[in-house]
């Protein structure tokens, strides 16, 4: 049994060594550029925005999940949500994506599926909430709070979340600057 667990654990892709540099990420995982660029073009979402939100949500960890609450220091409680994988998509939202796109076999721990989901969600947010696809700050707020929560302004009482959204915007700007050096075609096409 332990051997099966070890074999399964070794199948998870490790996060990039330098998650703060888009060029380093794509040098380490070349297929991630292909998948990210495809999602960017398919959903008309700037690649730096996709990367910055994924950086914040999971730090590019395939097996990311929200932290549990612990009781008495050793009894694990439930997780606060069903968020999982690179995109931290909730079960219901992930299922909506799978149905809407016909990608019924999509997995949240597969980078290609997760980045495509994020493009789809940002596209939906742009349509529903009228947030520009390149507006990393407001797109992140809507990503975190949900499209309905954003519309109701649920983020306004959460200064910590607005600060986090500001960091996402800054990270998107850094990624954009980096990508102009290593993949200029990825930032000039949108």
Task: Label every PLM stretch briefly.
Residues 1-2:
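Sec-dependent signal peptide recognition
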Residues 12-190:
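Catalytic glycan-binding domains that act on GlcNAc-containing polysaccharides
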Residues 7-10:
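C-terminal motif of bacterial Sec signal peptides marking the signal peptidase cleavage site
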């Amino acid at each position: 049994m332990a051997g099966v667990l070890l074999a399964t654990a070794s199948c998870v892709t490790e996060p990039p060594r330098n998650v703060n540099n888009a060029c380093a990420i794509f040098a380490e995982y070349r297929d991630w550029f292909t998948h990210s660029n495809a999602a960017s073009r398919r959903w008309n979402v700037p690649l730096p925005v996709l990367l910055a939100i994924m950086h914040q949500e999971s730090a590019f960890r395939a097996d990311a999940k929200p932290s549990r609450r612990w009781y008495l220091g050793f009894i694990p409680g439930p997780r606060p949500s069903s968020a999982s994988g690179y995109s931290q998509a909730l079960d219901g939202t992930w299922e909506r994506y799978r149905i809407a796109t016909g990608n019924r076999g999509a997995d949240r721990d597969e980078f290609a599926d997760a980045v495509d989901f994020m493009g789809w969600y940002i596209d939906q947010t742009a349509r529903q909430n009228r947030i520009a696809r390149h507006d990393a700050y407001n797109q992140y707020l809507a990503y975190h709070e949900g499209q309905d929560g954003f519309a109701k302004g649920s983020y306004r009482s959460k200064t910590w979340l607005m600060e986090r959204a500001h960091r996402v915007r800054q990270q998107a700007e850094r990624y954009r600057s980096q990508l102009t050096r290593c993949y200029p075609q990825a930032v000039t096409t949108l």
